Amino acid sequence: MTVSTFNRTWAKVIVNALLRYGVKHFCIAPGSRSTPLTLEALQLQQNQQAQCHSHFDERGLGFFALGIAKVTNDPVAIIVTSGTAVANLYPAVIEASLTHHKLIVLSADRPPELIGCGANQAIPQQGIFADYPIAGVNLPKPAEHYNAGWLVATIEQACVTQSQQGGVIHINAPFAEPLYEADENAIGTHPWLKPIQSWLINPQTKWINSQTIQSEVSMHENWDYWRTKRGVIVVGKLPVEQGIGIKAWAETLGWCLITDVQSCVDANLPYADIWLSNNTVHQRLLQADIVIQFGGQIVSKRVNKFLEAFKGEFWQVDEYSDYLNPFAHHQTRFVAKAHHFLRVHPPLRQKPWLLEPLALSQFCAGFIEQQVGGSLNEASLAHHIEEVLATSGNLFIGNSLFVRLVDALCKLPEGYPVYTNRGASGIDGLIATMAGVAKGSGQPTVGVIGDISALHDLNSVSLLNKISHPCILFVINNSGGAIFDMLPVEAQAKEQFYRLSHNYEFAPIATMFGIEYIRPFTWADLKAKLKLAYGRKGVTIVEIKVNDQDGSNLYKSLVKQISQAEIA
């Protein structure tokens, strides 16, 4: 058998191991060294066993894969060639690692004899992602003296680790030339495959049958005591299914419920980021005996300040075993899904122990509406974001100012899926992630990002052409990084080194990539054009051009005025 044919046979085993693990999507960047992996992934697509996606920019491709992984909860494979192509996946690897989404990086490599000798496009790739992957596999150059069963077992063992912990696997696969002109008829019939032939012909068969670790949570030994006390529940980022029941549980206990925009839990005390600026309410909330926090990655600065200031009994509930304790609490930690925790901690019906947050939250609803006004701007879009969403769809929110405005000013429908990149909270790859969420879900998706984020990920506008159902990408153009208006930095330095003001507009970008584009000036105009956009099969870019400091100024004004409100 020729080298090129055995390369393909070796790659066939790798991609089939991933198929049996649950990979349904292969995201592929162009490259020569990865040809064996690419062609075998395409073979799965031709057999209608998987979908293949392509993109010319590995950084965007990584985030596109992350978006698919977010919405499907399935592992997603990424195939790239050798060299800096691998390094371009680093931001997506970091984000997926911190949020436990399952990415599998398949990096093709030069064979060992070409590393460290000046060969073209050859860099040390083993361990390139440092400690971010939860499993790393550095395969040898394909050779028949390695047992085929060993190759399957090596891949599947890494997958078993990922199935239990989430996160990223890095599989580095060297291939020697030649890479082309393989004997297609010999790829699947080589005697080397004989030990795994029954596995290979049955897509449902796994080489390693591992049982998922069952970590049943037990009721806290003092729950009967703590459920009679004054409590506050804080809900951070949660999957939709885990948020079900938290609101009713909190209301039965009579405890205050504070929810993050990523929680997918209906807020009975919305606008917490605003009303917690009031020191009287903040201090009364600190009189709680116990705080229970579900999930993490909380957006609100004032909610985080409350958590930092609280010194009582603190319980943290999260399905992963990561150390979540930014404020060094003496805490009790439950490694459990939220709904599993609720099941074994039945509530005791009590009257609410603190009414001021409810009263101030209700006041904020009318006050915010009055302050935001009827103009179309970033604050009013955040406050009324529900009005631009599809009935059954997704919301993807970028980072920086807008996610804070949504968290502070809006009340989303119960259980509406919200996606973010709040693991490392970077602005890279946001368009690509939104495209992945839309592609992976097949549902109408609204994404909202800032202008600097859009400029940072401009290549990924190309990915929007892969979406064939109605989706809306809002670009809030405040001519720079408005989030930095919140910083106490001297004006000239802020302008030149933080804000980076510009005069760019996004209509020419939409034209270049062949994407529908609208620029509304009023809410009536927006709603009329959105009706048309939701009737199209594809993505529409909506540019909202706003004054550079309006959003940040309104945000600061709301916080200041509520902080000064008199509370009896």
UniProtKB/Swiss-Prot annotation:
<dbReference type="InterPro" id="IPR011766">
    <property type="entry name" value="TPP_enzyme_TPP-bd"/>
</dbReference>
<dbReference type="GO" id="GO:0070204">
    <property type="term" value="F:2-succinyl-5-enolpyruvyl-6-hydroxy-3-cyclohexene-1-carboxylic-acid synthase activity"/>
</dbReference>
<dbReference type="GO" id="GO:0000287">
    <property type="term" value="F:magnesium ion binding"/>
</dbReference>
<dbReference type="GO" id="GO:0030145">
    <property type="term" value="F:manganese ion binding"/>
</dbReference>
<keyword id="KW-0474">Menaquinone biosynthesis</keyword>
<dbReference type="GO" id="GO:0009234">
    <property type="term" value="P:menaquinone biosynthetic process"/>
</dbReference>
<protein>
    <recommendedName>
        <fullName>2-succinyl-5-enolpyruvyl-6-hydroxy-3-cyclohexene-1-carboxylate synthase</fullName>
        <ecNumber>2.2.1.9</ecNumber>
    </recommendedName>
</protein>
<dbReference type="Pfam" id="PF16582">
    <property type="entry name" value="TPP_enzyme_M_2"/>
</dbReference>
<comment type="pathway">
    <text>Quinol/quinone metabolism; menaquinone biosynthesis.</text>
</comment>
<dbReference type="InterPro" id="IPR012001">
    <property type="entry name" value="Thiamin_PyroP_enz_TPP-bd_dom"/>
</dbReference>
<comment type="similarity">
    <text>Belongs to the TPP enzyme family. MenD subfamily.</text>
</comment>
<dbReference type="GO" id="GO:0030976">
    <property type="term" value="F:thiamine pyrophosphate binding"/>
</dbReference>
<comment type="subunit">
    <text>Homodimer.</text>
</comment>
<keyword id="KW-0808">Transferase</keyword>
<keyword id="KW-0460">Magnesium</keyword>
<dbReference type="InterPro" id="IPR004433">
    <property type="entry name" value="MenaQ_synth_MenD"/>
</dbReference>
<keyword id="KW-0786">Thiamine pyrophosphate</keyword>
<keyword id="KW-0464">Manganese</keyword>
<comment type="pathway">
    <text>Quinol/quinone metabolism; 1,4-dihydroxy-2-naphthoate biosynthesis; 1,4-dihydroxy-2-naphthoate from chorismate: step 2/7.</text>
</comment>
<dbReference type="Pfam" id="PF02775">
    <property type="entry name" value="TPP_enzyme_C"/>
</dbReference>
<dbReference type="InterPro" id="IPR032264">
    <property type="entry name" value="MenD_middle"/>
</dbReference>
<dbReference type="InterPro" id="IPR029061">
    <property type="entry name" value="THDP-binding"/>
</dbReference>
<keyword id="KW-0479">Metal-binding</keyword>
<dbReference type="Pfam" id="PF02776">
    <property type="entry name" value="TPP_enzyme_N"/>
</dbReference>
<comment type="function">
    <text>Catalyzes the thiamine diphosphate-dependent decarboxylation of 2-oxoglutarate and the subsequent addition of the resulting succinic semialdehyde-thiamine pyrophosphate anion to isochorismate to yield 2-succinyl-5-enolpyruvyl-6-hydroxy-3-cyclohexene-1-carboxylate (SEPHCHC).</text>
</comment>
